[in-house]
Amino acid sequence: MEYNYYLYLIYPISFLIVFFLCKNRNKYRLFSGLILLYMASSFVGSMIGLGVIDVNANKEPKLIPILFHIVMLIVLLLPFKSYDKFRYSKLKPINSPLLRPFTYLIIIFCLIGIYGDIQNINVNAIMTDIVSIRDELQENEKAVSFTDHFSFFCKHYGYVALALAYYYMKYSPKDKFTIVLLIICSLSSVFAGLQNGGREYLIKYVFIYFVFLYYSKPEIDTYWKKTNRSILIVFSSLAVVVFAVITVLRFSYSGQMDSNMVTAMFNYMGQGFANFSAIFNHFPDGVAGGGMHFPIFVGHSFSVINLNQSINSSLSLNTFSTTIGSWVFDAGIYATVFIVLIYQTLMRYVGRRKFDLFTMIYMLWFYEFIFSCLFFHNQIFSLARLLSFVAIFIVEQLMKANSVTAKSIR
């Protein structure tokens, strides 16, 4: 093995240093947990790069790309340290008559999204041919109906429903029907991911539900604490089973299934760190000018499905390279720095807010984002996604404008 392959170890060592530099780790438990999660993922990536875990990755370690990668990830992670303080804050009540109508509208949107996604899930295809689903998506990605667009718009409100569930558990704990319905609605993103045999939505949801428990536990009653723990156990168990089934089917169909299932799992967890240097070295200026992830801002789109069919490269392009790698591949190094700074600014803004329902919504969105950063950036800023964010911001302003001085609306 060449000496430079040991450069991969810079990843976990760097995250370990950040972890120990974080004082009062008991106070910043979730932030410390995020750092450890990144350290674990990068350690697996290091083992892939060193050949200890034998999988097919674009192994091309270079010092400058690795240092760039680490700095960008840490810049994105640091704002989450300020979020931990909200666990020790009381969720502020909303004194607006618009709360109930907003809740019912979110429930309706999420149920419409789930219904549309269930209709599009081809169980037989998932059980026999995962790859063909992706090919079909590429062929039909522009030929979608209004219902499909509306379902895509609705799925972004799953975590809004989860934040609302937290609010009702605190201020209306006896409204069990609404709370349970909101928890069901929070699964909208999971159903959206199952359309194409996606695994990341399942794992992401379990992570977000854990975050939800972390912040809600100090303020909700014993009944909902126990219920939430039970729900987390059920969701986690289902996620592991579905994740394993989809992984087996995908690799067995493509002829790449190794006899060791654990190897495939490790590959999923750490390949982004093993792949980044090659992406950085071969595509420093990007290939799509932002069209892969930010089409609404750059005015054109570029398909992220079956990239090797549209880009001539010896690298395997449909592999993880973490979110930073996805942005470098899409828009180039300098644009990636700019995007990272924008995200950090927005995340710091949320950390300076008062702890209310909308702060919780924005936090859940950003926690979903930072978890996705381990793999790739699949949160494409389409018009539907942008409008869904803008709509929540407008609703927040309307609630502030229509607030009343009476007790919170319950």
Regions found by a protein language model. Give the residues of each.
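N-terminal "leader" segments that precede or initiate the main folded domain
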Residues: 1-90, 178-189, 205-209, 213-245, ...
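Membrane-embedded catalytic interface detector for glycan/lipid assembly enzymes
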Residues: 2-5, 80-206, 210-219, 241-253, ...
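Membrane-interface micro-motifs in multi-pass membrane enzymes
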Residues: 2-8, 61, 146-159, 197-201, ...
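Hydrophobic alpha-helical transmembrane segments
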Residues: 3-20, 41-52, 97-103, 175-185, ...
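Hydrophobic, aromatic-rich transmembrane alpha-helices
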Residues: 14-23, 158-173, 338-352, 405
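Membrane-interface helix-loop-helix junctions at transmembrane boundaries of multi-pass membrane enzymes
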Residues: 24-30, 167-180, 350-361
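Small-residue-enriched transmembrane helix-hairpin modules in multi-pass membrane proteins
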Residues: 130-150, 232-348
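Hydrophobic alpha-helical segments
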Residues: 317-410
